[in-house]
């Protein structure tokens, strides 16, 4: 029952898709059946003779099947090519996991062609396993165990397949700073323990080509020595790229390919090479010389995306055997590299055989169906119907997990062309497997019209009938080739059908017949196209209430402009010709401060609807009406001699009116006038009510001001002199008291040091002796 479900879903999907696509046909500049087919998947062409009437364009023949049938086109005359898929199964006797082997598609633009691809996982499918090992110094214990793995690895493969082969390669890093120590002595022996024998560092060494000889594996791997480098990340991506890019050197067969990547650390990727002055991007090509990657110091590390593409292209499934601390790092890497797995490697690699078996079972139980790069004109989508009951629809690639041996799973592949394409091919494959499906794509854009329709008599003997349309001989044009050009070029005839030298003939809405436009009959009900250049119609006008020009009761559309009847106006005849809603209590339209449009006032700036009476933000013109107020009320001021002429529009009110604006301005004599302005209909038109009393202020007493000022200055001067005199007296008094105190302290008991006595006494020294 399982294979029937995808077929039923396929049929239902195609019927649903066809139903949706056939509901509409959007066409533009259609004159042939091919143009119609390219317009959209829902378009069909009627080849019936004389299907179009006078003035109808050839594009009338292009419509949905339902519309053509409703217009009287027989079903046998409807050209509607479909997208088709033809499959060719695999040759008998060949072990294939993917079928069919070849598919031929005939694609109509916009219409998908669908076909089924079946994958059946085979038991005992041949396997090639390449063991790629990190030989940096931290892997010294692991190398000792791997040297003994040859027999175990082959026995593990033989449990899975009848034909298994193993190979070996190793890597360290680029041999430049800062990746390795470039001191000559360190290059000879990079290990930290000088007594231990180590080999010089290298980027990648291909040690053993894929073989089924386990003894040879153990012999060659047994010769390997540990090496070393400086930084923690290793050059593993460099090595993986060479393993994928050198199939002949590695010895890959066209079978399942496994790459076991064993390490205890991270990896360098694109851009890290700049640290060692390596700027050239990795080219993804094979550069092995004497089994060594000698161009390592010339090319940067590959990017993860670049490596993922190369591995997928080579159908290589990587298994990352890494230590516990690196598991999460490489799990992130497997999210980018499809068909890859991660296993936790013990510190001494003793569990590597079980790790490989577990990872292989995980990889082989999941199938990704994908295709190579396609141009933008081709779109591919996958529907996956998996054996575990899970289904996915319209995915960029097929994906099924839990695939069991000899249990088929089905993928529905839908291919759509966006335009009429050139013949081309592409390949669908299950990632990690060698089987492919070759898809050949051909355009389905031509109409297989009846040969009988190529009768020249229908075209007056001056052309041939192709799919219901005349193709005229040279010198003749027209629907039935009835117009002779008389030596005039088609450009000259068409020139008279162009408006203002436009590039569009008859505005794109008619045919140029013998130099005159014959306008098309529109597909839109009640639409009429007319004019010398078919530039006019009766529907492309403004609409009101969902109708052109508000409907026939309001007006009619003439060449883009509404012509309203006597009761309506406006660009869409949306307004009644009435001003009733614009009149104020005095019957003035919009209070003289606006215009009435559609029975609604459009007020002048500042004035508010509905009747333009109030202007909250307008300034009160008090100062401007002060001269008229003075002459009207007090018969004085600048307008006193011609008050009636200058202020004839301003009326003096005898009593105050509520709602006016209070003003207070000076008259010509400096007195204050208090008055109220009452606005009338219109702009800047006011009546005025003036208070009887003027507020006049007496002038200042000049003599008092001058006398007071002079007296104040004199008094201030006298006061300053008195203050100065008092301060001087106090200072002298303080000095006098200090002198008196010093005088009392003085004592005159000592002799004058300058006085000399007039007598001198001299003693005879001999007198005492006698």
UniProtKB/Swiss-Prot annotation:
The modification Phosphoserine is found at residues 746, 757. A motif (Cell attachment site) lies at residues 397-399. InterPro entries: EGF_extracell (IPR013111), Integrin_b-2_sf (IPR015439), Integrin_beta_N (IPR033760), Integrin_bsu (IPR015812), Integrin_bsu_cyt_dom (IPR014836), Integrin_bsu_tail (IPR012896), Integrin_bsu_tail_dom_sf (IPR036349), Integrin_bsu_VWA (IPR002369). Mg(2+) binds at residues 136, 138, 234. Keywords: Calcium, Cell adhesion, Cell membrane, Disulfide bond, EGF-like domain, Glycoprotein, Integrin, Magnesium, Membrane, Metal-binding, Phagocytosis, Phosphoprotein, Pyrrolidone carboxylic acid, Receptor, Repeat, Signal, Transmembrane, Transmembrane helix. Ca(2+) 2 binds at residues 173, 229, 231, 233-234. Both Ser-746 and Ser-757 become phosphorylated when T-cells are exposed to phorbol esters. Phosphorylation on Thr-759 (but not on Ser-757) allows interaction with 14-3-3 proteins. Residues 1-22 form the signal peptide. Glycans are attached at residues 50, 116, 254, 501, 642. Residues 725-770 are cytoplasmic. Residues 23-701 are extracellular. Residues 124-363 form the VWFA domain. Residues 449-482, 483-535, 536-574, 575-613 form the I-EGF domain. Disulfide bonds join 25-43, 33-447, 36-62, 46-73, 191-198, 246-286, 386-400, 420-445, 449-467, 459-470, 472-481, 483-514, 497-512, 506-517, 519-534, 536-559, 541-557, 549-562, 564-573, 575-598, 582-596, 590-601, 603-612, 615-618, 622-663, 628-647, 631-643, 671-696. Its main location: membrane. The keyword Cell division does not apply. The modification Phosphothreonine is found at residues 759, 761. GO terms for biological process: cell adhesion mediated by integrin; cell-matrix adhesion; cellular response to low-density lipoprotein particle stimulus; endodermal cell differentiation; heterotypic cell-cell adhesion; integrin-mediated signaling pathway; leukocyte cell-cell adhesion; neutrophil chemotaxis. One of its GO terms (molecular function) is ICAM-3 receptor activity. Heterodimer of an alpha and a beta subunit. The ITGB2 beta subunit associates with the ITGAL, ITGAM, ITGAX or ITGAD alpha subunits. Found in a complex with CD177 and ITGAM/CD11b. Interacts with FGR. Interacts with COPS5 and RANBP9. Interacts with FLNA (via filamin repeats 4, 9, 12, 17, 19, 21, and 23). Interacts with THBD. This is Integrin beta-2. The lineage of its organism: Eukaryota, Metazoa, Chordata, Craniata, Vertebrata. The gene is ITGB2.
